[in-house]
């Protein structure tokens, strides 16, 4: 359980970092668009979204819901530092990378293969962290027992 909180804290911290990189001319704070695939691997995003008080108290950063599962406000302490738009993409990681290439997505939660493929083709993207590391190991252990 402690690992998931640390991963979520890292996720929110990465949003804080990106908040300074994206500008929206119509508001005082930037708007970040975060795309994800609807899998259990990206549940950490919604752990952060659904537990703002926990993360505010423990880490000083939190997401507050404006429209559940779609729009949030990112706070550092009591200061709003970004608007966060959450976009569910059901067509796979390549679709997310297409959106990123088009400038429609700022942060993405997806597997490595499409990221590596698009970076190899020239897309300006960086992997900043793993959100899960042990799921494959558990599956393989069960398959080969």
UniProtKB/Swiss-Prot annotation:
Membrane topology according to the record: Single-pass membrane protein
Keywords assigned: Membrane, Transmembrane, Transmembrane helix
Domain of life from the UniProt record: Archaea
Coiled coil: none
Keyword Membrane in annotation: yes
PROSITE patterns with a match to the protein in the record: PROKAR_LIPOPROTEIN (PS51257)
Cellular component per GO, a single term: membrane
Subcellular compartments: Membrane
Protein biosynthesis found in the keyword field: no
Transmembrane segments: 4-24
Name this polypeptide is given: Uncharacterized protein MJ1180
Source species: Methanocaldococcus jannaschii (strain ATCC 43067 / DSM 2661 / JAL-1 / JCM 10045 / NBRC 100440)
């Amino acid at each position: 359980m402690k690992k998931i909180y640390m991963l979520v804290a890292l996720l929110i911290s990465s949003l804080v970092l990106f908040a300074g990189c994206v500008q929206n001319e119509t508001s005082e704070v930037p708007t970040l668009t975060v795309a994800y695939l609807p899998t259990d691997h990206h549940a950490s995003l919604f752990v952060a979204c659904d537990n703002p008080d926990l993360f505010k108290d423990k880490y000083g950063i939190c997401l507050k819901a404006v429209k559940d599962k779609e729009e949030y406000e990112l706070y550092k302490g009591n200061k709003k530092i970004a608007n966060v738009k959450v976009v569910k993409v059901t067509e796979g990681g390549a679709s997310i990378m297409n959106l990123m290439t088009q400038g429609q997505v700022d942060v993405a939660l997806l597997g490595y293969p499409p990221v590596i493929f698009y970076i190899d083709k020239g897309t300006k993207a960086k992997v900043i962290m793993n959100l899960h590391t042990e799921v494959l190991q558990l599956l393989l252990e069960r398959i080969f027992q």
